[in-house]
């Protein structure tokens, strides 16, 4: 980072956060292309056609301001070289470079805040499965959870105002406004169910940065409350005095909110509040009562509407009791169930049976949604009956078997954390029979005749490596088939949810 800072010559302008002049520097676009300082890689790329030069960038900026961008029509929008499906090399360069520029103030502040601190680097925290051990440890002690969909109708000016606290460069903010107003369907980028993006895939870096910075703004209140309340377990006198001061600040903070909400919200005194977010959805769990969770729901709706001008319908926030409802989160149906156990106690000549119920976090495989995904991907019909995959009939037999087997192995790998993996047998049956029907269709034969001729060993790709994992992890233990499917394993190398539509 020091080399990066020196190369960008930010020392003279860092105090004002002036990043706009850097858009005329050619090496910015090399950074945007390969995330390094090697310009030769950029010039060797045929997609840029060896036209990356300072003169071209300056000429492009000049042409941008010579056009009148305040008047739009449908044809102009479709033909705009900056957006749409036009692969104009200059527009790609400017957008990629600007995405790097707006990240610079955040990166420099992060590096300066970490000086003198020893940071433990762990790539395992990038895994989606790293969330579930946390839920397993915490949720079994909690009562209620708010299942919340983050509002996605963000006003364009709100995004710009969010960056004003970090980037004081007015010219950069004007350029950001230009990009955002050119793209009039901005909200579809962050709507989970919409996939028709007008931005090029190369420019999603800017989109994700703006969205995450915006979410970080209203997410900070949870981080603040949790970071302060997490020290309550400490018993030192200094920490005790710090807690008194902290609660004094909270009471003052709540009194300030009284002016807007006409009620005192004693929400931030709950030391058992836990927060988890992934993409456009987050969970807020607490050991408190139903009344407390209703107050949180009321607070969030008003907070988004009053301070971020985002309309959030109360129906997007669901309050559930963990013992009675299942949460659809990260592809699992999670719940907290009571696990009864009976202990026999012997005292002299008398014996007693003591019943005890322990709360246990239980993630299960959502078999019905999975079958719906298989039906959408044309592996089975809506009733779950396997069908052939005609679009793969032109592939070789080994490629067909490998594709079907890879889909099942990925699903089995992702749902290894469930204690009820026996339900995956239905998915395995659908994929195996769909594979057999695809091969039979290719060879113009029936499934029975095809398998009889080649043998059942043809579909060995569908046998997972779970047994090998257990034998390596527990070499001295022996597991039955039933015990194998009840054991939970959380893998720390999964960085995305398996999408059946993109196999």
From Swiss-Prot:
GO biological process: mRNA processing; RNA splicing; tRNA processing
Keyword set includes Cell membrane: no
Annotated GO MF terms: RNA binding
Subcellular location: Plastid, Chloroplast
Keyword Transmembrane: no
Major location category of this protein: plastid
Keywords annotated in UniProt: Chloroplast, mRNA processing, Plastid, RNA-binding, tRNA processing
Record-linked Pfam families: Intron_maturas2, MatK_N
GO terms under cellular component: chloroplast
UniProt-listed InterPro entries: Domain_X, Maturase_MatK, Maturase_MatK_N
Family of the protein in this entry: Belongs to the intron maturase 2 family. MatK subfamily.
HAMAP family found in the cross-reference section: MatK
Function comment: Usually encoded in the trnK tRNA gene intron. Probably assists in splicing its own and other chloroplast group II introns.
Protein name, per record: Maturase K
Organism name: Diospyros virginiana (American persimmon)
Upper lineage: Eukaryota, Viridiplantae, Streptophyta, Embryophyta, Tracheophyta
